[in-house]
Amino acid sequence: MDINARLDDVALTRIQAADMFAEFALNPLPAALASVQGTHPRLYLTPDRIRELRQTITSTHAELWREVLTLAENAVRRGPPAYREDDGWSGEEQLWQREVGNTIPYLALASVLTEDPRFLNAAREWALVSCAYPTWGLGRIDGMDLSTGHQLFGLALIYDWCYDGLGEETRQRLRETFELRAGAMFRAAASGTAWWGKSYLQNHLWVNVCGLSAVGFALYGELDQAEFWIGLPLVKFRTTMEALGSDGASHEGIGYWQYGVEYMLKFMMLARQLLGEDLFVGEWWPNTAGYCQYLMLPRHAWSRTNCNVDLADCPRGNWYGPDTLLRGLATVFTDGRAQWLAEQVDSAGIDAPGAKWLNLFWYDPTLTPMPPTDLPTLRHFSDMGIVSARTDWSGDEALMVFKCGPFIGHDALQVFDYDPGGGHVHPDANHFVLFADGEWLIRDDGYCAKWTAQHNTLLVDGQGQMGEGAQWFRGSIPLSAKARPRILRAESTDDLDIIVADAAEAYAKKAGVERFTRHLLFVKPAALIVVDDIVLKAPRDLELRFHPGPQEGEEQGAAFICRTEKGTTLRIEPLTRDGVSTSATIVVAQGNHGNDLHLYTVAMHKKTATWRNATAFSWAPDGEQPQPVTFAEDGASMHFTVGDRTVGITP
C-alpha cells in the first residue's frame, strides 16, 4: 500500500495539536462552571453579589468604595494612554501597558455599581484603545508576557461585568482580541515557546496565566478554546501550589511577593467560585501573611517609599497592596492579624492602588483585627532561610533581618532540576540588614545587579557567591551544586536573640570555603555583635563587608562612627584586630538599568585560612552615644559586655 508522506506529516501535526489541547481539557467539567454558561456577570460578581455590594458600599465598605470611586473618576478624566513603543525604561516589555489593564476593572466596577453611563463609556474607551495597541510587548515578547497578562485580565472583567451595556460591536472587538492574544499566549505556554512556561515559582507565570484564565472564564460557552484557557492555568497553578515551601516566605522579595500573591489570589478565588477547587493547600498560604508582617518596617517609620525590608529585587515601598492581599488572606484563613495589618497600611496611606477594587470583594467586616503584640518578636522562616528579629511591636522598635538559605528554599531545591524562577534572588547568604530609631543603619543594595560585594557578607579573593555576576541571579549554578547554606539556630529571649548560620555551601568549591559560620547576638535594644568563624582549605584574601545606611563616617580610635540624617549614631567596631586591616570608603557598585550605586563600605581584610572575627554594632538616637562593646577571650570562648550585660559564644 502506498502512503502519502505529506498526509502523514499533516496527521502527525494534528495529533500533536490534539494532545496539547487534551492535556488541558476540563475533564470532568466542573458543575459550577457549567452552571454559568450563557450568563453574565460570573467573574467574582453575580447578580446577587451586585445587590449585596450596592448595600455594603453605603455601610461597612463605604470608605473602601470611596477609594475605588475616586480612582475610577480619575481614570475617566485622564483617558487611556496613547500607544508608545518605548517608555524609556522597560524595553521590549512595554510595561506601561500594565496600568491599562489595571485601570479597566475600576471603570467596569464603577459602571456596574453606580449605573452611571460615564463609567461605562470610559471603560469601553479604555478597552478599545487597549485592543487597538499594535503590540503588547515588542518582538518575541509581543503578546507573551506581563503587559498581555494584565490587559487580558482587565479586558475579561469588562467583557463579563459590562456584557449587556457594551453592545455587540464592542463585544465582537473584544472577542477578536481574545482570540488573537489569549490564543497566542495559550499556544506559547502549552508548547514551551514562552520562556516562563515552567517558571512555577516566578511572578511572570502567575500573572500571565491568571490573565489567560480570566478570559477563559469570561468566554466559556462562547468560544470552544475557552475551556483550555482555563485548564492550562489550573494545571500550572496546581504545580505551583505543590512547589511552594512551608514557611510562607518568598525568594523574590516582598515587592514581587505582593505582585505574585495578587495574581495567584485572583485565580484561586475564581477557581473556588467557578471550578469548585480549593487551591489553598499546604503550609505556605496560611503562613504567608506573616511573611509580610515580619518583613515590614516598624510602622511609625512607614512612608510611601520606605516601609519594607528590601531583600532580593525589592523596593522599600509597596508595588501591589498589600492591604487587598492581606484582606483576602484574612478572609480565607480567619486571620485577625492580617486584617489588622491591612487596616494599618490603609491608615498610613502607604498602599499601592493597582487593584484596590479587590477590597470590596475580599474584606470581611465581621473579622476582628488583632494587633501583633502577642506575637514572638523573632520569626524564623525555615524553608527560605530568613530570620526577622525585633525588639518589640511598639512601632518604634529596632529590627534586624538575616538571610542564609538556598536560593529558592530548601524544599524547592530538592524538587527541581532546573531553575523554576530564581532570577530576582541575590547572592547574599549570611547577609543582614538593620533598622533602628526610624532609619536604616545597615542596608541592602536593593533592586540591583547580582553581586555579593554589595551585601554584608564575605568575599574570597574578591569573589562572591555562586549565582553572582549578572543582572539576574544565575540559579542554575547553585542548583547544580545543590548548595544549601542554612540557618543552624534562631532563638529569642526578652533581652537577647541568637542566630547562627553556615554559608559555606554558597561559595564555589574552588573558593575552598569549608566553614563560614556567622553568629549574631542581638543584645536588645541597641547592640548587635557579629562573630564570623571562617575556615578555608588554604590561605586566601578574605574580606568582610558591611554597608551602613549613612553614606559617610569617621574613624574614632578603632571604631567607625556614622550619623544618619535624623541624628542617630551608629558605631561599628572591629573587636578582633590581630592581623586585620580595616577600611572605610565609597564603593561604586553596579546598580539597576546600568546606573552606578554608591555604597559606603566598612571592610575588614585578612589573608588567612582560619579567621575568627568579631564586629560590634551599637547605636543611639540623637543626643545620646552608643554603648561601646568590650571583648574578652577565655580559651575558645568569647565574651562581650554591653553596659551591665555580658553575653558570649562557646564552642
Model-derived regions, located:
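Well-ordered alpha-helical scaffold segments within catalytic/enzyme domains
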Residues: 39-59, 101-117, 129-137, 151-169, ...
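Internal amphipathic alpha-helical repeat/solenoid segments
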Residues: 72-99, 132-144
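An acidic intrinsically disordered interaction segment
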Residues: 63-72, 107-125, 163-181, 217-235, ...
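Active-site lining segments of carbohydrate-active enzymes
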Residues: 82-92, 143, 150-255, 266, ...
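Mature N-terminal, pre-catalytic/accessory segment of carbohydrate-active enzymes
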Residues: 1-66
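Beta-sandwich/jelly-roll carbohydrate-recognition scaffolds of carbohydrate-active enzymes
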Residues: 60, 68-83, 375-378, 385-388, ...
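Extended polysaccharide-engagement surfaces of secreted carbohydrate-active enzymes
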Residues: 256-651
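Long, well-ordered core segments of solenoidal/helical folds
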Residues: 61, 68-80, 121-138, 173-195, ...
